[in-house]
Amino acid sequence: MRIEDLRKEDWKLNERLEYLAKRGEILEEEYEKSVKEILKRVREEGDRAVIEFTKKFDGVELTPENMEVPFEELEKAYEEIEPEVREALEFAENRIRVFHEKQLENSFFKEEEGIILGQKVVPLEKVGVYVPGGKAAYPSTVLMNVVPASVAGVEEIIMVSPKPNKYTLAAAYIAGVSRVFQVGGAQAIGALAYGTEKIPKVDKIVGPGNIYVALAKKLVFGTVDIDMIAGPSEVLVIADERANPTWVAADMLSQAEHDELAASILLTPSEELANKVKEEVERLLSQLERKEIAQKSLEKFGTIFLVKDLYHACEVANYIAPEHLEVMVREPMALLPELKHAGAIFLGDYTTEPLGDYVLGPNHTLPTGGSTRFFSPLGVYDFIKRSSVLYVSREGFKRVANQAEAIAKAEGLTAHALAVKVRKND
């Protein structure tokens, strides 16, 4: 794991920093052509293309008849998993539900002398949830994506996941998924966006995935809505000299094991801590079941940056705009006002990112690749839409007609002005 020095006035010119800050753009250029081809074929060929790509990328032989997982399999998985895992998933589901219920919006109406104005809030009808599979299975991702949709009142929740295991299926049962299809990758995103013979077209697609999934979501946006660009995972840790190097290293490795394209970054003003964390990462790496994946991730995107002080660390963190931001310093609350761009901010030594992944309650589906500058964590608000509601009586019309007509004439829209004028004589 490399150590870079940013304690200079021109720190933004550091090549490694620029590489990490712009990694979303770099990855897109590399994979976009193949993703476009996959989407094109799914749109034109439907299930046939989905089945072909599933065999090619996942090594799974599908037919139109077995693409959908029978609901009985979800119930069976729920009953078969270990009692402690079932209890943990139900515990997490409840905490996630309670947190997200606070995000619910209500319709409102305001009345004023012949005019009623308001906003009607309604849930989306049909949503697609992508849950990663393959190299790892994520029942927690099922809960984090499905529960907010359930809280919002979405009528039909369609889940897609390549080779879902019993824990993923059990979580789908607990969270209230409507239907499950065992497909993944860009082909699954295309199927949800365009619809196939078996997989229904949805109104919105949510959920994290690899670079193929993230790019596919970006490319189908407009045909359907999406939650965000949630690609390979990232963690950035700000730590001072008193931070525990083993804890810091463990938290960095917890992201590196996700994906070979995951990024693990440390910002610290302490050279001593930087060297100790580097040693601990190397020591702990050998203990991981997924050490090969973590090793490749660290080689590509793992970096320790030396900074001038903690406020400089905040400036660098805002420049990178990470998915997960951990603050392991003596007074973490003091830095919170300085932190502008992060999907989730974990304050304090004990607030390790995996707690947020699983059981705390706030959503773990977060924007990546620098998109925390304009995207927010997944929430109930992603599964609702708003319609403006307007009512004007004859009396209310007289209060606003002249002004509306004047603006219409100024814009040269005579039919607009006429629509107002013809009502004045009533």
From Swiss-Prot:
Keywords: Amino-acid biosynthesis, Histidine biosynthesis, Metal-binding, NAD, Oxidoreductase, Zinc. GO terms for cellular component: cytoplasm; cytosol. It holds the Pfam family Histidinol_dh. The gene is hisD. Catalyzes the sequential NAD-dependent oxidations of L-histidinol to L-histidinaldehyde and then to L-histidine. Zn(2+) binds at residues 255, 258, 357, 416. Its EC number is 1.1.1.23. One of its GO terms (biological process) is L-histidine biosynthetic process. HAMAP family: HisD. NAD(+) binds at residues 130, 187, 210. It catalyses: L-histidinol + 2 NAD(+) + H2O = L-histidine + 2 NADH + 3 H(+). This is Histidinol dehydrogenase. The active site is at 323 (proton acceptor), 324 (proton acceptor). Belongs to the histidinol dehydrogenase family. The keyword Metal-binding applies. GO terms for molecular function: histidinol dehydrogenase activity; NAD binding; zinc ion binding. Its cofactor is Zn(2+). Pathway: Amino-acid biosynthesis; L-histidine biosynthesis; L-histidine from 5-phospho-alpha-D-ribose 1-diphosphate: step 9/9.
